[in-house]
Regions:
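Beta->alpha loop/short-helix hinge microenvironment recognizer with preference
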Residues: 1-223
């Protein structure tokens, strides 16, 4: 309250919880600024690796181990393709973020990886991609699928009987990278439900009612 007028304003104390949409705004902004400082003057690409529905129950039960495996395999797959790319033949850098839920809060693990179209080759030379095409999404999906299944078997996991032969990996050009970083920063440090989506809360029933927007599903692989 102001001592010189009747104006009053409520300021909530910071709880510091990672699910709090207000507390994590500052952390998201800091992360974005750190990533912005690392941006190179080259074209960037956003590669999304999606785990099929048949493996989601297994992944949910063993999330720590399998999430780590997904990060490792996704990055290794991109580096393999980078070394074989005729224009690059280079080790690619990457920034990877795991998303675990849809807007409906359904468990839907997928990795977003931001990749610069440039790298250092085996002779320590800087190589830059020409154009807006990096990798074929279907080719990435085939290699990613084979490596994930092999990795799960090597780790001793029992796979479901029906595992789809076609997985989805999308690879799209995102300009100089900043739009993709801004997109990821909105989800990286915040909870899965934004404050503006909450409609009602019943403390007795311990239920929360919230709004969500249906996302557009894509059945193909970009590239």
């Amino acid at each position: 309250a102001c001592d010189h007028c009747t104006h009053r304003e409520v300021r909530l104390r910071s709880c510091g919880h990672r699910g709090c949409p207000r507390c994590q705004q500052h952390a998201a902004t800091d992360w974005l600024e750190r990533q912005r400082a690392k941006l190179l003057p080259v074209d960037y690409f956003l590669v999304t690796f999606t785990l099929p529905a048949a493996l989601r129950r297994l992944t949910y039960r063993h999330s720590r181990d399998i999430h780590d495996l997904l990060f490792q395999i996704a990055i290794d797959t991109l580096r393999t393709f980078g070394r074989r790319h005729p224009e690059l033949e280079a080790d690619l850098a990457a920034t990877a973020v795991l998303h675990t839920h849809t807007r409906k809060l359904d468990y839907h693990p997928h990795l977003h990886v931001i990749v610069p179209g440039a790298g250092i080759d085996q002779k320590n030379r800087w190589r830059t991609l020409k154009g807006r095409y990096l990798f074929n999404g279907k080719a990435l999906a085939r290699v990613f699928r084979a490596r994930v299944i092999h990795g799960l078997k090597q780790a001793g996991f029992e796979l479901p009987e029906r595992c789809p032969s076609r997985w989805v990996v999308q690879c799209q050009h995102v300009g100089y990278g900043l739009p993709a970083l801004k997109y990821l920063s909105r989800y990286l440090y915040r909870g899965v439900v934004a404050e503006r989506q909450i409609v009602a809360f019943d403390p007795h029933a311990r239920t929360v009612t919230f709004r969500y927007v249906r996302t557009r599903r894509t059945g193909g692989c970009a590239g």
